[in-house]
Amino acid sequence: MENKINSQSLFQEALQYIPGGVNSPVRAFKSVGQEFPRFIKSAKGAYLYDVDWNKYIDYIGSWGPMILGHGDDDVLEAIQCQLKNGLSYGAPCKQEIELAKKIVELMPNIEQVRFVNSGTEATMSAIRLARAYTGRNKIIKFEGCYHGHADEFLVAAGSGALSLGQPNSPGVPEDVVKDTLVASFNDIESIQALFEKYKNEIACIIVEPIAGNMNMIFPQDDFLAKLRAVCDENNSLLIFDEVMTGFRVALGGAQSIYDVKPDLTTLGKVIGGGMPVGAFGGRKEIMQEVSPAGPVYQAGTLSGNPIAMAAGIKTLEKVSQDDFFVKLEAKAKQLVDGLNEAARVYDFNFHAKYLGGMFGLFFCNEKVAVNTFTDLGKTNLKMFNKYFAYMLDNGVYLAPSAYEAGFISIAHSDEDIEKTICLTKKFFQDNQS
């Protein structure tokens, strides 16, 4: 793509008024070695159009929410109908109940739910609730799992799995994260050791059931069931962060696939249909501790916004159709099978995985186990960056980081998928060692 001048110009202007020129760091494309991102003008179906009128097949989908594709006509109609009645009330509305009922109906382990405005709000609220319910302060998270930008989550592991958390962002006091313990994903022994060391101090474990913030790493060897057992043995709560996987890998989220019951679940992305929505929910006895039913404070000016609720209701109605996830996963399978076959033909160190409408791309041989954050760091990150640039220049918009999962929508056509596979074949052919 030769024409990028408007994106480049807008980025230079943005740098004057917005830190780093973007409102979320990954959007800057710095992690993939690009000088500037593409500024988007419009989106429809499976496509993005930038300010230079370049067209892209989009495999980010606004980082997951656009499971129906961009600008779904039914969702837009639901939003437009609500717009006539006002933007926001700061008061209860019927749509809140409708979306809550739908979530409780579809998510196997949510009996009550509270709406917030983002995934970060959902996870920080769930942690506060878990601490209050158990009367304990320490939490366990996993290296490489991202739960938003609340202070207690901005922690990197120390020299070993038993290290107390150390902040990995300036501005986060060590005292804030001293109660955040970090373990290795898929390593149950590190969890057991933490409970032995801090018995009766750990309020909860929070985990992405499928780790989508370190590409796409699946739980191994009944890892989630073992977490459930450890929590039960120690009277701690288990929180599934399904902001990414909820209504994305299956109608009932990852918890329905692995048949493991979390005490609390956090949601976002798909439940807003592209509007800013987050939620946390779980067992009624726990959720009844949330104000005003109980003493655990949580509030939000725009929580339960009627426009966002309307978008979410219509989105969940459509993904609830009997054959929706069958069709969606068939598209993901077509893409991943094609990419893996291309790697086999050209003997290229690459493999892809998928589940539901989510996929991961790994620049290493399929025989190489990628089960932890450390494993992912050993893949060929430079080759991913090269692949990203090639695909972007040829009209395919992938996540601008080797640590991010990709998303397919029901709007992607066979032609979109085949074009992606053909371009990948050409890249593998041109970059054979």
Curated annotation (Swiss-Prot):
Query: Pathway involvement?
Result: Porphyrin-containing compound metabolism; protoporphyrin-IX biosynthesis; 5-aminolevulinate from L-glutamyl-tRNA(Glu): step 2/2
* Entry cofactors: pyridoxal 5'-phosphate
Record's PROSITE patterns?
AA_TRANSFER_CLASS_3
- What transmembrane ranges does the database entry give? none
Q: What is its main location?
A: cytoplasm
* SUPFAM superfamilies to which the protein is assigned, alphabetical: PLP-dependent transferases (SSF53383)
Give the matching Gene3D superfamilies.
Aspartate Aminotransferase, domain 1, Type I PLP-dependent aspartate aminotransferase-like (Major domain)
Q: Where in the cell is it found?
A: Cytoplasm
Provide the disulphide bond pattern: none
UniProt keywords (A-Z) are: Cytoplasm, Isomerase, Porphyrin biosynthesis, Pyridoxal phosphate
Catalytically driven reaction(s) = (S)-4-amino-5-oxopentanoate = 5-aminolevulinate
Q: Does the keyword Cytoplasm apply?
A: yes
Q: Which GO terms describe its cellular component?
A: cytoplasm
Mark the residues carrying the PTM N6-(pyridoxal phosphate)lysine.
K269
Q: What is its EC number?
A: 5.4.3.8
GO annotation, biological process: protoporphyrinogen IX biosynthetic process
UniProt cross-references to Pfam families, sorted A to Z: Aminotran_3
Q: Which domain of life is it from?
A: Bacteria
Q: What class of enzyme is it?
A: isomerase
> Any idea which GO molecular function terms this record carries?
glutamate-1-semialdehyde 2,1-aminomutase activity; pyridoxal phosphate binding; transaminase activity
Q: Which family does it belong to?
A: Belongs to the class-III pyridoxal-phosphate-dependent aminotransferase family. HemL subfamily.
Identify the NCBIfam families for this entry: hemL, PRK00062.1
What does the subunit section of this Swiss-Prot or TrEMBL entry state?
A: Homodimer.
* Protein name, per record: Glutamate-1-semialdehyde 2,1-aminomutase
Organism field: Francisella philomiragia subsp. philomiragia (strain ATCC 25017 / CCUG 19701 / FSC 153 / O#319-036)
Q: What is the lineage of its organism?
A: Bacteria, Pseudomonadati, Pseudomonadota, Gammaproteobacteria, Thiotrichales
What gene name is listed for this protein? hemL
